[in-house]
């Protein structure tokens, strides 16, 4: 039988509507005990095709209706209403005919008498089934009526879950009045031990719960089991008091002594690795020094800008107290080009080699150079501007990556490039005017933590051949005396005229490039810039190991440059206005975009006014400022890059 939501219908219709009789192989738990004679004859006739499947189904259905009449007994259900007498006049219950068969009907009890609330429970307590309180509430006092098998008879009142189909084969259905009823449940319980009494207290825990323990103390004791689970007559043990809260744990990150040297050493290695790679990320620009000198003179006490500090000559590193003894941890990192680096206890101090990276300076003064000229170069040519990071250069993403891979990494990490015998010491930037070639040179000096010296080729050319050669030699000598150093020579094509009439600086430049960047020039990087690379002869071109083309800024870079320049004028444009400006400034260089913003501010007369710049004023200035690089010049630069450029 299956339970369906239509249980509110008359009970005498349940077997008729919900009894599945079409199955010929039901499970033992659900098979009905139909009369064996008629059922066997029906199955025999159906198996031999004497009757059709429809006839067999009708016969089995009639047998089921006859048999289900035994289950239709009146059932009083308090609290849910009762059924009227007319509801039981129809169906199989109103059939007074006895069941025909060779065996008498089994005296089965109604299935509804075991439901909760059908009859009041007796006061005899729990009996049988282990004294379960659930079964005891549904059984009456005369529970065990004897039978021939020594167990409860089929007429015994069970709970709702127990049906006739679930009885074991050992249970007999015949009743027997000869057996006496079993003793009450109280007599079946064992006697308690002598040390226990019913007057002992049970679990007496407060109902309000436990107070919160501070910190991470011990867990509260488990809740007491309910009374029905305790055997009657056995006293529960006295509950243990709650343990005292654990003391607060000390701070997890401290600087203990030598006992935790291993963990602190591992932490120091991790910090060194993190600081080692942080230098090559695109970080924001750092604040300049208090005295305004972003690239100070290189001495033994100054930091090189890459996380290393020089060690005084003649001193040794004290290994004790490096990781223990309460001393503070030192900043660790990989070797960089700086004099007298601090040795790491895991690696020996690197000896400068002619094929490695930037080596330590000799400390000897430059020979063959006027001291006055050297002092003039040191005071006038050293760039003291703010440091420039990669984020300050708009666009040029591929060029930045190529410089990191082909120039900065070989210079700062010589062991990481075993294939190259010597890292490059010269680089040439060529491209249209105002594209940020000098800005890239300043950024290289910042990334290397080097002193920046700047020379203008046009200024050296106008000073004459003799004076220009003297200044050029003094600049290279000053760079060798102040390693690590970056010597930036802008407008390199001005030093190399088309005709070698004796007034050019080609020969002194080649001599300085060979000597200043030769085997004795460790720690010097020469950066040249030009907008006319075709003016360089083959000898000068071969002196520069790396040659990179700095193209005009793309749309995203132009938008970034315009936003920065207009923000200085107090102008904030919408996205649509900025997109219109970016589209209208195609072919502009970075310098020309800056001139556009200055022209708009000058026309608006913002020198003494507080009114911000508007889009109309910038649009009016756009009609007067345009790109200066002709397409023919751009095509020639692209062709020269294909022939002689390093590519990126």
UniProtKB/Swiss-Prot annotation:
Binding site for ATP: 394, 434-439
Top-level taxon of the source organism: Eukaryota
Reported cofactor(s): Mg(2+)
Biased composition annotated in UniProt, kind: Polar residues: 10-27
Region Disordered, residue ranges: 1-36
Catalytic activity reported: ATP + H2O = ADP + phosphate + H(+)
Keyword Cytoplasm: yes
Enzyme category, top tier: hydrolase
Stored InterPro entries: AAA+_ATPase (IPR003593), ATPase_AAA_core (IPR003959), MT-severing_AAA_ATPase (IPR050304), P-loop_NTPase (IPR027417)
GO cellular component entries: cell cortex; cell leading edge
Keyword Nucleotide-binding: yes
Sequence similarity: Belongs to the AAA ATPase family.
Role description: Microtubule-severing enzyme that negatively regulates cell migration and wound healing. In migrating cells, targets dynamic microtubules (MTs) at the leading edge and severs them, thereby suppressing motility. Microtubule severing releases ARHGEF2 which activates RHOA, which in turn regulates focal ahesion turnover via focal adhesion kinase, as opposed to F-actin polymerization, to suppress cell motility. Negative regulator of axon regeneration that suppresses axonal growth by selectively severing dynamic MTs in the distal axon shaft and growth cone.
PANTHER family found in the cross-reference section: AAA DOMAIN-CONTAINING (PTHR23074), FIDGETIN-LIKE PROTEIN 2 (PTHR23074:SF33)
Protein name per the record: Fidgetin-like protein 2
């Amino acid at each position: 039988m299956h339970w369906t939501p239509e249980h509110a219908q008359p009970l005498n219709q349940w077997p008729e509507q919900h009894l599945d009789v079409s199955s010929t192989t039901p499970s033992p738990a659900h098979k009905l005990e139909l009369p064996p004679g008629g059922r066997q004859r029906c199955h025999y006739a159906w198996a031999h095709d004497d009757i059709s499947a429809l006839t067999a189904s009708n016969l089995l259905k009639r047998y089921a209706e006859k048999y289900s009449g035994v289950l239709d007994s009146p059932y009083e259900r308090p609290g849910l209403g009762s059924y009227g007498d007319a509801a039981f006049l129809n169906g199989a219950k109103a059939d007074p005919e006895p069941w025909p068969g060779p065996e008498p009907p089994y005296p089965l009890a109604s299935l509804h008498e075991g439901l909760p609330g059908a009859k009041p429970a007796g006061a005899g307590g729990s009996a049988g089934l282990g004294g379960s309180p659930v079964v005891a509430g549904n059984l009456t006092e005369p529970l065990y009526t004897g039978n021939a098998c020594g167990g409860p008879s089929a007429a015994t009142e069970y709970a709702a879950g127990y049906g006739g189909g679930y009885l074991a084969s050992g249970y007999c259905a015949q009743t027997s009045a000869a057996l006496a009823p079993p003793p009450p449940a109280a007599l079946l319980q064992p006697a308690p031990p002598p040390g226990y009494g019913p007057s002992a207290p049970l679990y007496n825990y407060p109902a309000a719960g436990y107070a919160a323990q501070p910190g991470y103390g011990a867990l509260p004791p488990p809740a007491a089991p309910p009374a029905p689970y305790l055997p009657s007559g056995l006293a529960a043990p006295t509950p243990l008091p709650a343990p005292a809260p654990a003391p607060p744990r000390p701070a997890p990150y401290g600087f203990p002594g030598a006992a935790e040297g291993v963990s602190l050493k591992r932490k120091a290695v991790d910090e060194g690795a993190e600081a080692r790679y942080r230098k090559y990320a695109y970080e924001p620009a750092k604040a300049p020094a208090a005295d305004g000198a972003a690239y100070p003179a290189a001495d033994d006490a100054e930091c090189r800008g890459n996380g290393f500090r020089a060690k005084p000559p003649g001193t040794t590193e004290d290994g004790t107290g490096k990781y223990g003894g309460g001393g503070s941890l030192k900043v660790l990192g990989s070797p960089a080009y700086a004099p007298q680096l601090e040795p790491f206890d895991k690696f020996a101090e690197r000896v400068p080699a002619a094929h490695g990276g930037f080596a330590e300076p000799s400390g000897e003064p430059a020979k063959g150079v006027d001291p006055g000229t050297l002092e003039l170069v040191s005071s006038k040519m050293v760039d003291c501007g703010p440091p420039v990071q990669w984020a300050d250069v708009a666009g040029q993403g591929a060029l930045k990556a190529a410089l990191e891979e082909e120039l900065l990494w070989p210079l700062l990490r010589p062991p990481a490039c075993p294939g190259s015998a010597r890292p490059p010491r010269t680089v040439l930037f060529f491209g249209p005017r105002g594209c940020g070639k000098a800005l890239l040179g300043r950024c290289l000096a910042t990334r290397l933590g080097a002193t920046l010296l700047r020379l203008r080729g046009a200024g050296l050319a106008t000073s004459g051949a003799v004076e220009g050669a003297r200044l050029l030699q003094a600049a290279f000598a000053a760079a060798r005396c102040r390693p690590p150093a970056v010597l930036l020579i802008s407008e390199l094509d001005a030093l190399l005229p088309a005709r070698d009439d004796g007034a050019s600086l080609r020969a002194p430049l080649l001599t300085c490039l060979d000597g200043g960047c030769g085997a004795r020039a460790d720690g010097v990087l020469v950066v040249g810039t030009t907008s006319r690379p075709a003016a360089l002869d083959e000898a000068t071109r071969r002196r520069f190991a790396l040659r990179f083309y700095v193209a005009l800024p793309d749309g995203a870079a132009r938008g970034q440059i315009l936003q920065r320049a207009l923000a200085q004028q107090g102008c904030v444009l919408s996205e649509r206005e900025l997109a219109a400006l970016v589209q209208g400034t195609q072919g502009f260089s970075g310098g020309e975009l800056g001139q556009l913003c200055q022209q708009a501010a000058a026309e608006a007369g913002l020198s003494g006014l507080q009114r911000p710049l508007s889009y109309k004023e910038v649009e009016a200035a756009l009609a007067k400022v345009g790109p200066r690089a002709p397409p023919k010049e751009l095509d020639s630069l692209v062709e020269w890059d294909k022939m002689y450029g390093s590519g990126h």
